[in-house]
Amino acid sequence: QVLPPLQGEGDVPVPEPEEGVDELVEYLPRSAVGAACTATAGAYQRKVERLLGLVVDGKQSVADCKAIKAFQTREKIKPANGYAGPVTWARAELLAARKDLDPGRRCPVKKYAVACVDLDRQLMWVRKGKKVTFGVVNIRSGRVGYATRTGWHSVYWRHKDHWSSIYNTPMPYSQFFSGGQAFHAVYGQIATPTGSRGCVNLGYGNARKLWDVLRKGDRVYIWGKRPGS
């Protein structure tokens, strides 16, 4: 079920994001706050170790911390203290996907446009045949109890200045594909410890670009499961 928006299209434009909203700021537990190079293993330790070519043991070593800290410094993730949190993992997954977009060949290649959503890696892209028409970006999908529905869907309603009737919050560049689940922009960090309430969240700039790529009737294919959900 999709409830009508609180505001009509164009009646009240959704707010623009604040400056600096796309900065990469890592989520830290108290034990890692203030450390120059943390000894605490991060929630995404194994994933980050694998992506950075480190020994995958889920334990934080001095070498691990130095390597993760160097990666964070290079990618302008703050604070750069070696903690393997959701922001560091998301950035590492994105860079890996730019080199090898779909290693498992999970997204079907069709003659028509398909929005590919990989819940395992929290990534999405759009392709038409062999051509990628919207490059891979980080996303945030549904949390526990609000799983983003997998399988085939179609974009059936697009509403640029959407306000949620359920949560009374702006959902810029909404493109609905399954009931109340939609691609839409959020204000702030995409890579967070908890997920969305079912929608596929994108950074504001990426959602705006996706708006110009997808059309009503375009297909959406979703697979996998959000880590921790």
Regions found by a protein language model. Name each.
Residues 31-94:
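Short acidic, glycine/serine/threonine-rich helix-capping segments at coil-helix boundaries
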Residues 1-46, 53, 104-105:
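N-terminal low-complexity, Pro/Thr-rich disordered segments
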Residues 59, 114-116, 174:
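Short, surface-exposed charged micro-motifs
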Residues 45, 49, 65-68, 89, ...:
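Extracytoplasmic/secreted envelope proteins and their assembly/folding machinery
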Residues 78, 99-112, 146-152, 156-229:
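Exported/periplasmic cell-wall-interacting domains
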Residues 102-145:
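A structural motif detector for short, solvent-exposed N-terminal "entry" segments of globular domains
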Residues 84, 88, 96, 121, ...:
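A mature extracytoplasmic/lumenal domain signature
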